[in-house]
Amino acid sequence: MVGVNQMLAGELNYYSPYYRQVTMETYTSDSLVAARMPLAYGDVRKSFEYYLNHYNHGRPFILAGFSQGAMAVVDLLNTMADSTYSRLVAAYVIGYKVTDMGAHIRPAQDSADLGVTICYNSVRDNSCALPLLSDGNLVAINPVNWRTDATPALLVDPRHGDTLTVTLDTTSLLLHIGGYTRDDYMLPLIGCEGNYHCLDLSLFSDCLRRNMALRANHFISIAPAALPKP
């Protein structure tokens, strides 16, 4: 939560729920995933409902989750009421996949569109993908230049100062990271060399923070009817 707080604290007002996450060992067995994930989803749904009833006060909102949290965001998108979705600024599904285009899932096309879903998974190349995280994904965008084509973007690693190249592969919908030479990214148990799942937040935290503010300001400027009355 320290990293999340650094990214979201300040001008952004955020609500982060406690919920029962499954262990990494769970992902080694499909039967364990099927048995345990409903508990996590149930906790997040209840927490989101509590947030709407006690903290949101009719305001527009952003959903954001990473990895297992991103799975929960997809679940919320697929189960929320239309009236709730009408106040959604954007949903950030980071380090996971969107495999079903439900009524409330619209892929982001640029940096400022609204009611959309942002999704990406970072790898060195396609051979480094983890099927659990990205197989069958239908939604992707480059979080540096906010394009959905293969136009590359330069990114300075906020932790080390290294200059990286970030390119969306439009066939696999994986985000290719060029120039990363460190070995501090391996995901325990199910990770592999060249899969940058553990960097999906830290590399792009500044990009995400700025984009959340941009989309929120855009929503407020064009959708005053969605704002609570004084």
Task: Outline where the language-model segments fall.
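Active-site machinery of serine-nucleophile hydrolases
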Residues: 1-26
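Helix-loop module immediately N-terminal to the HCX5R catalytic loop
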Residues: 28-59
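Soluble non-cytosolic domains of exported or imported proteins
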Residues: 34-42, 67, 198-202
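Gly/Ala-rich beta-loop-alpha elbow adjacent to hydrolase catalytic centers
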Residues: 63-73
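Extracytoplasmic/secreted cell-surface and envelope-processing proteins
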Residues: 25-26, 71-73, 100-103
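Structural recognition of the beta-strand scaffold that forms the well-ordered cores
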Residues: 13-18, 62-63, 90-93, 118-119
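Active-site-proximal beta-strand/loop segments in catalytic clefts of secreted hydrolases
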Residues: 18-22, 65-67, 93-97, 123
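Surface cap/lid and interfacial helix-loop subdomains adjacent to catalytic sites
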Residues: 45-57, 78-229
